[in-house]
C-alpha cells in the first residue's frame, strides 16, 4: 500500500514519538537504552485515574485531587515541573486549580504503554520542565498478519469498588486489514464520595467521567500514519482539598502522527490540537454555594524529529528536531445576581492569555563498545507569554482590593520572553551481564505558567481561587518571575539477572536498583506570605495569602527498587518479593522546607504466579511527615501502614476475573501529599483544618473479556 503525497505533506508538518515502535517502560533506568516490548504495561491497581497506574515506579507519588485528576509527583517535583506527553501530545491544565490535569485526559482504558524518566530527561522528549518526563501511550495500531485477511477483535471490562460505590466500564473494538486499521475505545466511570478508615464520608469526592477515542492507521512502504481523535466529558468531579468543585469539563482533541523509515534513519512527525471548556462551582448538597468560574483553553503544536543512523545496527544515532507548542487561555467568572461582592461585572482573571514555545534540539546517542553507551544533547527553547487587561467584579468597597490590583496590573507591560537552554549528558557502563551503572547531569529550565505570572487579584476570595496545591492558601501571580533552572545529578546502580522474563527487553528475573539524586534549582517558584485569613471564617483554622516568588532550592533523595525470587515449584508456582522504597527532601537555601516532599516510604509485596492465577499481598508504609512547609501551613501527618490483597484468574486466554481488598484493616490515615480537608471544614464551620483523610477499606472486583 502507498500513502498519498497529500497525506505525507500534511503529516510532515508534525512529529510523533514513534508509534511504529511500541515502548514498554517496565525498567526504570537512565534512558540511554530504550526498552521495547509488544506487551502493554500491567498494573496492580484498581483505578479510574491514570496517574495512579504508575504507583509502583520508584520516586513516584501522587498529590490528591479529584477522583480522576491526581497530580503526579516525581522526586519532589510536581504538576508543571514534569513534562506530561499523551501519545506525544502536550496538554496544558486550563484551570487555576489544575482540576483538568494533563493525565486526566487519558483514562486507564486508553493506556497501553508508559514511560517514566526522573530528572535527567533526554532533550528530545523533555523541554519546559525540570523534574522529569511521563509518557502515556495508546496500544500500537494492530493490522492483519497477511494479505486478504481481516482482523477483528474487541473486548470489554467492568470493575467496582465498595469504598465509594465506584463502577467503571470500558469497551474496545478493532477492525483491520494488512495495511489499514480502525480502533475504538470508550470508557465511563462513576463514583460517590469515598469513606475514610474511621467510617466518615469524605465530602465532595464524588465524580463521573466519560471518554471516547477513535484511532485510524495506515501503513506501507516503510511508513505509517496514525490519526487519533477523541472527546472527554466530565459532568462533575468533587475536590475535597479545594474551595471549588468541577461542574463540567468538555474537551475534544485530534492527534496526527507520521513515521517513515529511510536509508539514513527514521523521520517522526506529529501535529496535534485540543480544545477545553471547563467550569467550576458547586453541584451537590455535600458542599453548597453559588460562584460560577469558567475557563476556555486551546493547545496546538507540532514536532519534527529525524533519527539519523551514524553507525551500524543503531550503535550511533543523531536525533535532531524542532517543536512548537501554543496555549491559549481565557479565565473569567460570571457575576452572581444579588451578590454585593460578585457583581455586577464579570471578573476577568486571565484575558486572552497566550504562551508560545518554539524549540530546537540535537541529541547524540553513541555505543562506544559492548560496555559503554553515552548520550549528550542540547536544547534551545524560546517561550513567549502575554495577556490582556483585566477587571474586578465591581467598584464598591468590597471589591476595592481587587479594583486597585486590576488597575495596577493593567498599568504594566504583560508580555514576557524567556530564552531557555537545556543540557543533558548521560553515560551507561555495563561491565558484565549482571551489573549496570548509569549516571548523568542535566540542566533543565521551566518558564512560569500563565497563572503563576498573570493572576492579579488581591482580595482574599479571589486569591483562594488560584490554588493547585490543595493547601487551603490563596495565591496571586508575579509579573517579575524568572524561569526555574534545575541542575541535576543522578545515578543508578543496578544488579540484575542475565536473563529476563519474556525474553530480550523484558524485566530481569531478579534485580536490585539504587538511585540517589540531587537537584539545585535556581529561581525555584515558591511562595511568600503577603497576608492571612481565617478559613471559612473559623478562628481555629488560619490560612495564608501568598504570592509566587523565586527562591533558590535544593531537592535530594534516594530511591530503591527490587525483585527477588523466593520460591519456584510445581505446587506453589513462582513466588517473588518485589517493591520500592524512597525518601525526598526539599529546602529553600534561605530557609524553610519545600511543599509536598514525600517522607520515607516503602511499598513491598509478595507476588505468586501459578498457572492462570496471580496473587499479590502488598504492604504500603509511609513514615511520619514532620518536615512541612510553614508558609503554606502544611499539616503534619502520622505514619501509617496499609495492607492490600489482590488475586486474578485468567480463563482460556480471553476472560480475566479479579478481586481484592484495599486497606484490609481499614486503617484511618492521612496521605502526606493529600493537602487539607476543606470540604469537611466548609460543612462543620468549626474546629481546625485537618489533613485530608485517605481511603478506607474497599472490596474491589473486576472482569475483563476479550474476543
Features from the language model and the residues they span:
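C-terminal beta-signal and adjacent terminal beta-strands/loops
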Residues: 445-446, 527, 624-627, 649-707
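Transmembrane beta-strands of outer-membrane beta-barrel pores
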Residues: 158-164, 177-179, 188-192, 220-222, ...
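Surface-exposed extracellular loop regions of Gram-negative outer-membrane beta-barrel proteins
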Residues: 233, 277-279, 328-330, 335, ...
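Gram-negative outer-membrane beta-barrel transporters
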Residues: 367-374, 382-383, 505-526, 530-627, ...
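Acidic, small-polar-rich N-terminal luminal/periplasmic segments of exported/outer-membrane proteins
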Residues: 25-147
Amino acid at each position: 500500500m502507498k500513502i498519498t503525497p497529500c497525506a505525507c505533506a500534511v503529516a510532515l508538518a508534525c512529529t510523533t514519538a514513534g508509534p511504529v515502535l511500541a515502548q514498554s517502560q517496565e525498567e526504570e533506568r537512565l534512558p540511554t537504552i530504550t526498552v521495547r516490548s509488544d506487551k502493554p504495561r500491567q498494573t496492580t491497581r484498581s483505578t479510574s485515574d491514570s496517574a495512579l497506574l504508575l504507583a509502583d515506579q520508584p520516586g513516584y507519588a501522587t498529590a490528591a485531587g479529584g477522583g480522576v485528576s491526581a497530580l503526579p509527583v516525581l522526586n519532589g517535583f510536581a504538576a508543571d515541573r514534569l513534562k506530561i506527553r499523551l501519545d506525544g501530545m502536550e496538554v496544558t491544565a486550563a484551570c487555576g486549580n489544575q482540576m483538568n490535569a494533563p493525565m486526566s485526559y487519558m483514562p486507564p482504558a486508553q493506556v497501553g504503554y508508559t514511560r517514566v524518566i526522573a530528572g535527567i530527561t533526554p532533550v528530545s522528549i523533555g523541554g519546559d520542565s525540570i523534574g522529569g518526563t511521563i509518557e502515556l501511550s495508546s496500544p500500537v495500531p494492530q493490522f492483519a498478519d497477511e494479505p486478504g485477511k481481516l482482523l477483528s477483535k474487541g473486548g470489554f471490562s467492568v470493575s467496582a469498588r465498595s469504598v465509594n460505590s465506584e463502577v467503571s466500564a470500558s469497551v474496545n473494538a478493532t477492525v483491520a486489514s494488512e495495511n489499514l486499521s480502525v480502533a475504538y475505545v470508550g470508557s465511563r466511570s462513576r463514583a460517590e464520595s469515598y469513606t475514610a478508615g474511621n467510617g466518615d464520608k469524605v465530602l465532595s469526592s464524588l465524580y463521573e467521567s466519560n471518554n471516547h477515542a477513535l484511532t485510524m492507521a495506515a501503513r506501507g512502504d516503510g511508513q505509517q500514519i496514525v490519526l487519533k481523535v477523541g472527546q472527554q466529558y466530565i459532568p462533575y468531579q468533587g475536590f475535597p482539598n479545594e474551595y471549588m468543585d468541577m461542574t463540567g469539563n468538555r474537551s475534544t482533541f485530534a492527534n496526527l502522527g507520521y513515521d517513515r523509515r529511510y536509508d539514513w534513519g527514521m523521520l517522526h512527525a506529529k501535529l496535534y490540537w485540543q480544545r477545553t471548556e471547563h467550569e467550576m462551582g458547586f453541584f451537590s448538597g455535600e458542599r453548597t454555594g453559588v460562584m460560577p468560574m469558567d475557563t476556555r483553553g486551546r493547545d496546538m503544536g507540532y514536532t519534527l524529529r529525524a533519527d539519523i543512523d551514524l553507525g551500524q545496527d543503531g550503535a550511533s544515532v543523531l536525533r535532531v528536531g524542532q517543536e512548537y507548542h501554543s496555549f491559549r487561555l481565557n479565565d473569567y467568572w460570571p457575576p452572581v445576581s444579588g451578590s454585593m461582592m460578585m457583581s455586577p461585572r464579570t471578573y476577568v482573571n486571565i484575558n486572552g492569555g497566550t504562551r508560545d514555545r518554539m524549540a530546537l534540539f540535537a541529541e547524540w546517542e553513541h555505543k562506544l563498545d559492548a560496555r559503554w553507551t553515552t548520550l549528550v544533547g542540547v536544547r534551545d527553547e524560546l517561550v513567549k507569554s502575554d495577556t490582556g487587561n483585566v477587571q474586578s467584579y465591581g467598584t464598591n468597597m468590597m471589591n476595592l482590593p481587587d479594583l486597585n490590583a486590576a488597575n495596577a496590573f493593567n498599568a504594566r507591560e504583560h508580555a514576557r520572553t524567556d530564552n531557555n537552554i537545556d543540557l543533558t549528558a548521560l553515560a551507561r557502563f555495563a561491565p558484565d551481564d549482571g551489573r549496570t551503572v548509569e549516571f548523568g547531569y542535566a540542566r533543565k529550565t521551566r518558564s512560569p505558567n500563565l497563572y503563576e505570572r498573570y493572576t492579579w487579584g488581591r482580595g482574599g476570595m479571589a486569591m483562594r481561587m488560584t490554588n493547585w496545591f490543595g493547601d487551603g492558601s490563596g495565591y496571586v501571580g508575579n509579573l517579575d518571575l524568572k524561569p526555574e533552572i534545575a541542575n541535576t545529578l543522578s545515578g543508578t546502580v543496578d544488579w540484575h539477572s542475565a536473563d529476563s522474563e519474556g525474553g530480550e527487553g523484558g524485566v530481569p528475573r531478579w534485580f536490585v536498583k539504587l538511585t540517589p539524586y540531587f537537584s539545585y534549582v535556581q529561581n525555584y517558584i515558591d511562595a511568600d506570605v503577603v497576608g492571612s485569613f481565617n478559613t471559612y471564617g473559623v478562628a481555629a483554622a488560619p490560612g495564608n495569602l501568598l504570592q509566587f516568588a523565586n527562591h533558590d532550592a535544593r531537592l535530594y533523595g534516594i530511591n530503591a527498587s527490587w525483585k527477588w525470587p523466593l520460591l519456584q515449584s510445581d505446587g506453589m508456582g513462582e513466588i517473588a518479593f518485589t517493591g520500592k522504597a524512597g525518601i525526598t527532601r526539599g529546602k529553600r537555601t534561605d530557609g524553610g522546607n519545600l511543599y509536598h516532599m514525600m517522607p520515607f516510604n516503602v511499598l513491598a509485596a509478595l507476588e505468586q504466579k501459578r498457572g492462570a492465577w496471580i496473587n499479590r499481598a502488598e504492604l504500603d508504609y509511609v513514615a511520619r511527615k514532620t518536615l512541612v512547609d510553614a508558609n503554606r501551613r502544611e499539616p503534619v501527618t502520622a505514619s501509617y501502614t496499609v495492607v492490600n490483597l489482590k488475586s486474578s484468574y485468567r480463563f482460556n486466554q480471553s476472560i480475566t476475573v479479579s478481586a481484592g481488598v484495599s486497606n484490609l484493616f481499614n486503617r484511618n490515615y492521612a496521605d502526606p501529599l493529600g493537602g487539607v480537608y476543606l470540604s469537611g471544614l466548609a460543612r462543620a464551620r468549626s474546629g481546625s483544618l485537618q489533613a485530608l483523610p485517605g481511603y478506607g477499606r474497599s472490596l474491589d472486583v473486576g472482569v475483563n473479556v476479550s474476543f
